[in-house]
Amino acid sequence: MRSFILKTCAFFKESQVETANVQRQLLRHTLATMAYRSAKSVRDAPESFGSFSSGDKGRTPAQILAHMGDLMDWGLSIAKGAQAWHDSTPLPWSQEVERYFAAVKAFDDYLAGDGPLAASPEKLFQGPIADALNHTGQINMLRRMAGCPVRSENYYRADISAGCVGADQSKPGREF
C-alpha cells in the first residue's frame, strides 16, 4: 500500500509540474503574440508619431508604449515576488520602442527559466499581459488617426512562437 501511495503522490506531483510548464508556455506564447502585434503597430511609424495627439485627453503613442513597458516590468516583478510599479516618463519614440521590447524580452526570459512564479499564471495574464495587449490596439487605432495606418492581417496565419519577442518579427502571413 505504501508503495502505491508513493507512486500516486509522485504521479500527481509530476502532473502538477507538467501543468505549470504548460501554463508558462501559454504565457510565453501570449507574450510572443503581443510582441508580434505590437511590432506591427510600431513598424515604420514616423518618429513624430510618438507625440501624436488625437485632440482629446488621451495618451500619446509614446505615453502608451511607455505604459506598456512599465506593465512588462511590473509583470516581471510580480513573477519574481517583488511587485514594484514605476510610472516612466516616455522616451523619444524609437528609444521607447527599444525599451518596450527589452522589457518584454526580460519578462519572457524569466518565464523561460525555471525560477518560481510568485503569482499564478492566471493573475499574470489578467493583469499586466492583458492590459498591454489591449494597448497594442490603441496604438493601431492612433496610427490610423495619424494618417499612417497599419495593414490588417489574419493573425491566425501569423508565424508566432514562444521566445520570439523582439521588434524583428516574421513577415505577415496574409495582409489585407
Give, region by region, the residue ranges found by the protein language model:
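Extracellular-facing binding/remodeling surfaces
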Residues: 43-49, 106-110
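Surface-exposed, polar/charged faces of alpha-helical domains
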Residues: 113-116
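Helix-adjacent hinge/juxtasegments
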Residues: 82-110
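Short, contiguous alpha-helical
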Residues: 12, 18, 24, 28-42, ...
